């Protein structure tokens, strides 16, 4: 396959899960990574260096995703930005004629999800969201076995995940890395004061309301998706149960409530 026949790819947000997107595209002979988008200049250049060693061509590093969407060499985009950017990234990409793959969760809130669907239909572009669990051979086979009656009638599914994690620590006023374009990183979110309230800038946005969705939007999509997949459910829930308690780490909080929702 010649370079002209390959599908041109732009990966948006490459510090964490975006690195896995890069790895998968590099394994596929049909694709060529042509643009890397990240608001952290150091991260973008590091990824471009690694890609050049593996595919020969060095992608163009940019901090503004709109440059990738305007690039005729780009056919598709995948994005693994913080959650608050997911919907707008997909909508802008489809407006520019690109198909879009969005890392879970597909959006920061439900209204953004409906806007993505509307954009996909309006511009005639593909928009997909997924998790690595959907591509896991073991999980695929387990779900098929269960749905074929392998363990009898299933009436209840519980999504559980146990991981050894450090405390997210106390809220505070933490420094933003000098190589980060914070205005671009914040994008459609409201600016807060202090701007960064957790110590690990490139991960702790999960615990900041304007950018993430807590663990419900971080680990939650994996467990809820597998449960719904296994049960064959394709409708929205009609009831929600909440329960809580302060468990494990005693990070600083202004309230005394810890709530799980399911």
Each PLM stretch: what is its role?
Residues 59-64:
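Conserved SAM-binding strand-loop segment of SAM-dependent methyltransferases
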Residues 118-125, 141-156, 174-176:
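Basic phosphate/pyrophosphate-binding loop/patch that engages nucleotide-derived ligands
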Residues 19, 87, 91, 114, ...:
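A structural signal for well-ordered alpha-helical segments within the folded catalytic domains
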Residues 183-262:
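Rossmann-like dinucleotide-binding domain that binds NAD(P)(H)
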Residues 82-83, 87-135, 149:
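Beta-strand-loop-alpha-helix segment that lines the small-molecule cofactor/substrate pocket
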Residues 158-202:
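Core domains of carbohydrate- and sulfate-ester-processing enzymes
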Residues 76-78:
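N-terminal Rossmann-like NAD(P) cofactor-binding module of classical short-chain dehydrogenase/reductase
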Residues 1-54, 133-136, 227:
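N-terminal Rossmann-like dinucleotide-binding module
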């Amino acid at each position: 396959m010649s370079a002209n026949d390959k599908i041109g790819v732009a990966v948006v947000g490459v510090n964490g899960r975006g690195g896995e997107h890069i790895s998968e595209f590099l394994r596929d002979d049909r694709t060529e990574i042509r643009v890397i988008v990240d608001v952290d200049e150091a991260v973008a250049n590091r990824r471009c260096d690694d890609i050049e060693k593996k595919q020969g061509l060095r992608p163009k590093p940019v901090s503004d995703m709109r440059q990738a969407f305007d690039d005729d060499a780009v056919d598709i985009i995948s994005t693994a930005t913080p959650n608050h950017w997911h919907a707008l990234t997909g909508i802008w990409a489809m407006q520019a004629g690109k198909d879009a793959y969005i890392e879970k969760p597909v959006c920061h809130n439900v209204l953004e999800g409906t806007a993505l669907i509307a954009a996909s239909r309006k511009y005639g572009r593909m928009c997909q969201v997924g998790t690595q669990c959907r591509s896991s051979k073991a999980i695929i086979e387990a779900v098929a076995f269960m749905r074929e009656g392998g363990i009898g009638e299933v009436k209840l599914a519980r999504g559980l995940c146990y991981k050894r994690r450090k405390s997210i620590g106390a809220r505070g006023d933490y420094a933003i890395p000098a190589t980060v374009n914070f205005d671009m990183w914040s994008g459609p979110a409201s600016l807060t004061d202090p701007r960064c309230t957790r110590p690990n800038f490139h991960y702790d946005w999960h615990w900041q309301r304007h950018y993430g969705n807590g663990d419900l939007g971080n680990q939650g999509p994996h467990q809820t998706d597998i449960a719904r997949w296994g049960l064959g459910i394709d409708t929205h829930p009609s009831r929600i149960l909440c329960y809580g308690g302060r468990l494990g780490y005693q990070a600083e909080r202004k309230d005394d409530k810890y709530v799980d929702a399911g």
